[in-house]
């Protein structure tokens, strides 16, 4: 009697903030898991995305953007999380942006040179490169930086060449039993996913006005007799002015955020959702490691 082989392994997605790591993860999974927004540093937790296809299970670690400034407690912890997820993986996908190369990219590259895992270089947003003639010399420059397993020009947004990345990932998964059931997309709890969805809407509708020092706590997440969920979310900001900004004129902003978040939650949980949101000022939390621990920022460090 032959036993079918199965393959399973961990893959880290790394890169400086805002190069499209979360968008790439969502494309690889075929579902929106990691919080995506134009604002740098929006992925604060090591969300694990799981993609199972037949005998192959790829477990993705979506790291926070490694970046140079480490002044505040929250940023120190985020960089620590990003570095720790590089260590214990079969494969690393290093995402860079078009023909841009910055000191932050250099810093990530230096960390990767120290590691043992093979690295795929995903050159994202190639569809946005204005001067196509610049692309080839830039790819040659990148190729000279490190012995990459492969260099793949992609557009995470449109899906261009994402299947190529997925094929390379499959090829490098070691023979192993699957860690998760076939229908798992992420090992994070629904409560965590609810807070991520609210945070994404905050980023989307407040954009550059909103500092990173905003977080969401899910105070209540219960099933109701209608077969859905009652969810209460608490939005924590550092200053009274930020509270006014989140609430908006006559509550218009928080209403929009609530409506959009509820739609996404219903789609993700496949059930009706009753969502209530509050905004509260909790000053200085981004500099207080104890507060960060209580908010779950250091659960995986």
Curated annotation (Swiss-Prot):
GTPase is competitively inhibited by GDP but not by ADP, ATP, CTP or UTP. This is GTPase Era. GO terms for molecular function: GTP binding; GTPase activity; guanosine tetraphosphate binding; ribosomal small subunit binding; RNA binding; rRNA binding; small ribosomal subunit rRNA binding. When overexpressed partially suppresses the slow growth and decreased 70S ribosome phenotype of an rsgA knockout; RsgA may be involved in 30S ribosomal subunit biogenesis. When overexpressed partially suppresses the 30S ribosomal subunit assembly defects and cold-sensitivity of an rbfA knockout; an era mutant missing residues 39-49 fully suppresses these phenotypes. Overexpression is not able to suppress a rimM disruption phenotype nor a C23U mutation in 16S rRNA. Also suppresses temperature-sensitive mutations in DNA primase. The gene is era. GTP binds at residues 15-22, 62-66, 124-127. Residues 124-127 are annotated as: G4. Changing residue 17 to V: Confers sensitivity to cold. InterPro entries: G_ERA_dom, GTP-bd, GTPase_Era-like, KH_dom-like_a/b, KH_dom_type_2, KH_sf_prok-type, P-loop_NTPase, Small_GTP-bd. An essential GTPase that binds both GDP and GTP, with nucleotide exchange occurring on the order of seconds whereas hydrolysis occurs on the order of minutes. Plays a role in numerous processes, including cell cycle regulation, energy metabolism, as a chaperone for 16S rRNA processing and 30S ribosomal subunit biogenesis. One of at least 4 proteins (Era, RbfA, RimM and RsgA/YjeQ) that assist in the late assembly stage of the 30S ribosomal subunit. Its presence in the 30S subunit may prevent translation initiation. Changing residue 8 to A: In era770; 20-fold reduction in GTP-binding. Confers growth sensitivity at 42 degrees Celsius. Disruption phenotype: Lethality. In the presence of 1% protein cells grow extremely slowly and are blocked at the predivisional two-cell stage of the cell cycle. In the absence of Era and Rnc there is an additional defect in chromosome partitioning. In depletion experiments cells grow normally for 2 hours when protein levels fall. After 4 hours 16S rRNA levels decrease with a concomitant rise in the 17S precursor rRNA molecule (extra sequences at both the 5' and 3' end compared to mature 16S rRNA) and a loss of 70S ribosome assembly. The modification Phosphothreonine is found at residue 36. Residues 15-22 are annotated as: G1. Residues 62-65 are annotated as: G3. Changing residue 26 to S: Confers sensitivity to cold; overexpression does not suppress an rbfA disruption. Residues 7-175 form the Era-type G domain. It comes from Escherichia coli (strain K12).
């Amino acid at each position: 009697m032959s036993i079918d082989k199965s393959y399973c392994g961990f893959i880290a997605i790394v890169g400086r903030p805002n190069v499209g790591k979360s968008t790439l993860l969502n494309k690889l999974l075929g579902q929106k898991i990691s919080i995506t927004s134009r604002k740098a540093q929006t992925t604060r937790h090591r969300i694990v995305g799981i993609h199972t296809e037949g005998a192959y299970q790829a477990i993705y670690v979506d790291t926070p953007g490694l970046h140079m400034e480490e002044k505040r407690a929250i940023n120190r912890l985020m960089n620590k999380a990003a570095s720790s997820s590089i260590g214990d993986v079969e494969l690393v996908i290093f995402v860079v942006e078009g023909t841009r190369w910055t000191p932050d990219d250099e810093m990530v590259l230096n960390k990767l040179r120290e590691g043992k895992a093979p690295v795929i270089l995903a050159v994202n947003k190639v569809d946005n490169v204005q001067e196509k003639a610049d692309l080839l010399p830039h790819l040659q420059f990148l190729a000279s930086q490190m012995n990459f397993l492969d260099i793949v020009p992609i557009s995470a947004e449109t899906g261009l060449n994402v299947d190529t990345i997925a094929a390379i990932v499959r090829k490098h998964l070691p023979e192993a039993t699957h860690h998760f059931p076939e229908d798992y997309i992420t090992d994070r709890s629904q409560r965590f996913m609810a807070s991520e969805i609210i945070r994404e809407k905050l980023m989307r509708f407040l954009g550059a006005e909103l500092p990173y020092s905003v977080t969401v706590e899910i105070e209540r997440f219960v099933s109701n007799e209608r077969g859905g969920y009652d969810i209460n979310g608490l939005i924590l900001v550092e200053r009274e002015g930020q509270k006014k900004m989140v609430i908006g004129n006559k509550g218009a902003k928080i209403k929009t955020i609530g409506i959009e978040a509820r739609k996404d939650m219903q789609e993700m949980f496949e059930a009706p959702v009753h969502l209530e949101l509050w905004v509260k000022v909790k000053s200085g939390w981004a500099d207080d490691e104890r507060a960060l621990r209580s908010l779950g920022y250091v659960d995986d460090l």
